[in-house]
Amino acid sequence: MVQRNAKPENEIKAIIEAWADAVRRHDLSGILAHHEQDILMFDVPPPLQSRGIDEYKKTWDLFFKYHKPSQAFDIEELAITAGKDVAFATAIMRCGSGTFSGPPEKGGFLFRLTIGLRNADGDWRIAHEHHSVPSTD
């Protein structure tokens, strides 16, 4: 549960932590709980971009195919900058180690996360997600 009227950075941190927890549990309604209907996401696997909540929702089918509920989806190095109406957060994410918060194992990886949020009437909503990995070329 996200506490309203808290410092914006604390509210946003709680939203991102709840999102990551929902991902770990494969709880699609929890994943979507704080997202705008017109979300725009840039992801690592195709498609290049997903526009709107229905397209965003479809991207999780592929993720759930390879990520098991017992595997990590951990937030590391989270930084949040919040204004009155907009905010952004960046993090390094650990994905796919053998157990929650375990050390990275073969098949696990780190990726970069950037989230953009809008505040509408005191309700922070995720308007943009960008997932990326460094090029190995």
Q: Can you name each region flagged by the protein language model?
A:
Residues 2-30, 40-137:
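A beta-strand edge to alpha-helix "cap/lid" segment located at domain peripheries
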